Amino acid sequence: MHKHRKPTEADVTPESLFYQRRRILKALGISAAALSLPFSAQADLLAWFKGTDKPKAPPGKPLTFSQPADWKLDLPLTPEDKVTGYNNFYEFGLDKADPAANAGGLKTEGWTIKIDGDVAKPLTLDIDDLLKRFPLEERIYRFRCVEAWSMVIPWVGFELAKLIKFAEPTSNARYVAFQTLYDPEQMPGQKDRFMGGGLDYPYVEGLRMDEAMNPLALLAVGVYGKTLPPQNGAPIRLVTPWKYGFKNIKSIVHIRFTREKPPCTWNLAAPDEYGFYANVNPHVDHPRWSQATERVIGSGGLLNVERQPTLLFNGYAEQVASLYRGLNLRDNF
């Protein structure tokens, strides 16, 4: 059996950025021990030296929601400061701390979502319409990043299926496509290819219709009982807990129903590394690291972090495995 080494920070971080960061830390006289810390910890050290002063997001507003027993997990929650401070949102930078540092000025007042394509009722809804129309509930979900780290997060939102039924897709609609806000003035990574990882923006994602209708698929508007902070995808994002995190598109402004399979940003950028389905699967490795285990964020310190086995479909096989019956999960990763 072929043995896979554990991914290093250089594997999951763009190479040029990884070595540039190390050169800067050395120039600041940072010790060799600090250079051996994870990339995100090195970013924290740099932030301490920079003392950057950027707009801070206003505190989240408390939400009213139910707490159905069916959606609780007997697992400890990831600390809130980790959920809101350790993020991938390349529109605001590549480091895990960048979104929290750079997204504070994102304007979400008057936010609207356009819904069109193969639907009976094309329409545009603002975020307040959605909050009034669809009752909210809290769901505690596992979250698994393709970079082999994980969290347990208490999202607040409503089933995507409820919005789909409201829009009344036609029989032609086989997929649901999503698009993030495109606003380079607010999202600096969209105009700076280095800061934004060289991706083509706006960020886009998609699901098969049966995936989108699964009760697990959530449109989240809050976390930890409050409205989403910008770095977590305010004011509305997708949560599909059986899929890797890059499928969970943030700051959605457009939902389109289509007959054709929609493009997906990471699949376009690196199709051999990021598939359309992106189902969590410990038996199908990323080309550069194993997916058999995951680092549990919030456990231990920087040098003593718990790892645990990754579960097929992130532990949600009972709810979603039937969606992929007869599909080769290795080829359709």
From Swiss-Prot:
Q: Where in the cell is it found?
A: Periplasm
Manner of cofactor binding, per the entry note: Binds 1 Mo-molybdopterin (Mo-MPT) cofactor per subunit.
Keyword check for Mitochondrion:
no
Q: Out of the domains of life, which is the source?
A: Bacteria
Bilayer-crossing regions: none
Q: Which reactions does this protein catalyse?
A: L-methionyl-[protein] + a quinone + H2O = L-methionyl-(S)-S-oxide-[protein] + a quinol; L-methionyl-[protein] + a quinone + H2O = L-methionyl-(R)-S-oxide-[protein] + a quinol
PTM: Predicted to be exported by the Tat system. The position of the signal peptide cleavage has not been experimentally proven.
The EC code for this enzyme is: 1.8.5.-
| GO BP term, example | protein repair
Q: Does the keyword Signal apply?
A: yes
Needed cofactors: Mo-molybdopterin
For this UniProt entry, what's an example GO CC term? periplasmic space
Which keywords has UniProt assigned to this entry? Metal-binding, Molybdenum, Oxidoreductase, Periplasm, Signal
Extract the InterPro entries matched here.
Answer: MsrP, OxRdtase_Mopterin-bd_dom, OxRdtase_Mopterin-bd_sf, TAT_signal
Q: What is a single Pfam family found in this protein's UniProt entry? A: Oxidored_molyb
Endpoints of the signal sequence: 1-43
Listed under subunit, the entry gives: Heterodimer of a catalytic subunit (MsrP) and a heme-binding subunit (MsrQ).
Query: Tell me, what does this protein do in biology?
Result: Part of the MsrPQ system that repairs oxidized periplasmic proteins containing methionine sulfoxide residues (Met-O), using respiratory chain electrons. Thus protects these proteins from oxidative-stress damage caused by reactive species of oxygen and chlorine generated by the host defense mechanisms. MsrPQ is essential for the maintenance of envelope integrity under bleach stress, rescuing a wide series of structurally unrelated periplasmic proteins from methionine oxidation.
Q: What is this protein called?
A: Protein-methionine-sulfoxide reductase catalytic subunit MsrP
The organism of origin for this protein: Pectobacterium carotovorum subsp. carotovorum (strain PC1)
Q: What's the encoding gene here? A: msrP
